[in-house]
Structures are given as structure tokens and as C-alpha cells.
């Protein structure tokens, strides 16, 4: 399955200014916050990536999958990598996850492809 999401970078900037760390901690782990380096475009991209993953799994963010069940890191070539907690990888019977993030014209867009025998 494939999931896609697009986010306004300005909307994310407003949330960060208004709620500061409380906003970030709702959907990012401490290591993900460090990876974003306070860049609104990176924060928006990470938000979009987690939303895209939830859509690829056909559950959205909620009871079956929370933002913090997903972890974003970077490859040695700085490409985004996404994984889920072991519990969720098993729950969804995920074999692999592939991800891409792009930013342009004030928006961040992300795509996730999930390989699973359940989907």
C-alpha cells in the first residue's frame, strides 16, 4: 500500500510558535526533534511522513497507531527512513517500509510504501 500526505510549512511554523516543544513532543521523539534542527520545513516533512505512513496502513492516527509508534531516522546519504515499534511491525505484519519527503512552494509532501502480507 501507498500513503501520501501534504502539509503547509506555514501551518507547522504557527503551531511551533504557539505551542513550542509541547507541539513537537506530541508527534516527534527526542531524536527526531534533534534531526529537524528547528527547521520548519523538516518538522513539516516529518509530520507529513508519519501521516502518510498511517494512511498507507489504512488506519490513520489513533487507537491502532500513534505518532510515537513511528520512528524517523536518516540513511548515510541523508534519505528519510521510517520504521515502527516492533509491536506495530508485528501487528501490521510489515515486511518493509520505504519513504520519501520533498519540500517546495511552502509545502512538505511525503510518501510511504508499505510491503505487508496483510495489505
UniProtKB/Swiss-Prot annotation:
Primary localization class, coarse: cytoplasm
- Give me the reactions it catalyses: apo-[ACP] + CoA = holo-[ACP] + adenosine 3',5'-bisphosphate + H(+)
Q: Where in the cell is it found?
A: Cytoplasm
Q: Which Gene3D superfamilies match?
A: 4'-phosphopantetheinyl transferase domain
Keywords, A to Z, come to: Cytoplasm, Fatty acid biosynthesis, Fatty acid metabolism, Lipid biosynthesis, Lipid metabolism, Magnesium, Metal-binding, Transferase
One GO term under biological process is: fatty acid biosynthetic process
What EC number(s) is this enzyme filed under? Answer: 2.7.8.7
Q: Which InterPro entries match?
A: 4-PPantetheinyl_Trfase_dom, 4-PPantetheinyl_Trfase_dom_sf, ACPS, Ppantetheine-prot_Trfase_dom
Output a single Gene Ontology CC term carried by this record: cytoplasm
Q: Name one GO molecular function term.
A: holo-[acyl-carrier-protein] synthase activity
Where on this chain does Mg(2+) bind?
5, 51
Task: Please list the cofactors this protein needs.
Answer: Mg(2+)
The protein's job, in short, is: Transfers the 4'-phosphopantetheine moiety from coenzyme A to a Ser of acyl-carrier-protein.
HAMAP family in alphabetical order = AcpS
The family database entries (NCBIfam families) matched by this protein are listed as: acpS, pantethn_trn
Q: Give the family this protein belongs to, as stated in its UniProt record.
A: Belongs to the P-Pant transferase superfamily. AcpS family.
Q: What is this protein called?
A: Holo-[acyl-carrier-protein] synthase
- This protein's species is Helicobacter pylori (strain J99 / ATCC 700824) (Campylobacter pylori J99)
Amino acid at each position: 500500500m501507498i500513503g501520501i500526505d501534504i502539509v503547509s510549512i506555514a501551518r507547522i511554523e504557527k503551531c511551533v510558535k504557539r505551542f513550542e516543544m509541547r507541539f513537537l513532543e506530541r508527534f516527534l521523539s527526542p531524536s527526531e526533534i534533534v534531526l529537524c534542527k528547528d527547521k520548519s520545513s523538516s518538522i513539516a516533512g516529518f509530520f507529513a511522513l508519519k501521516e502518510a505512513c498511517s494512511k498507507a496502513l489504512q488506519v490513520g492516527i489513533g487507537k491502532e497507531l500513534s505518532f510515537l509508534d513511528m520512528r524517523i531516522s536518516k540513511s548515510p546519504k541523508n534519505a528519510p527512513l521510517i520504521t515502527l515499534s516492533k509491536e506495530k511491525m508485528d501487528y501490521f505484519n510489515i515486511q518493509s517500509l520505504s519513504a520519501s519527503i520533498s519540500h517546495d512552494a511552502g509545502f512538505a509532501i511525503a510518501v510511504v510504501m508499505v510491503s505487508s502480507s496483510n495489505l
